[in-house]
Amino acid sequence: MFRRNELNKDFNHVIKLFYKERKKCIKIMEMITEASIEYVKKQVDCGIDCFQLFETYCGIIPEQLYTEFVLPYSRKILNAAMNKNCKTIFFPKNYNLGLKHLNKDICDIASVDWQIPIETARTLLNSDIGIQGNMDPRLFFSDKNEIEKYLMSLSEFGKKNTNWIFNLGHGFIPGIDVKNVNFVVDWIKNHN
């Protein structure tokens, strides 16, 4: 949102803004947050059951900087849904050890990517928060035996963690084998 059509996804210009022009950055964050809150309220008024906030580039910001200067704005957006009795899912991609900063006041469920083992994410998260994730979508390029081996390990995790939702650690990748997607969906349905 800071710079459209940016080909470089390390966002150095945004991080530089955080360090050099903190007041300007805070003003921009406040504007984005207020617009997002209005959007969330309208979504809830239109009947959504759950709101998910994606922080796809969370991991490019140092954890301390994200926790101190971005997470409070994410919390405000998520709280707008929570204040209207709407469940929330928060996906701070690649936040990893920062997951320890999440609590029930921020979200109902934390979605995690494949960069952190699901068991580690669970130990970092407050036990009141559900967890969603974290299959690496690139696994769809593998064969069914390899996929099933991974699903078996997740199944064991699911038996011990009833507040877990199976999901990818991020979206689908172009070119994946749809037969493998169907295999995963069927496997999850049959092993629930």
Give the residues covered by each predicted segment.
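Active-site loop segments of alpha/beta catalytic cores
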Residues: 1-192
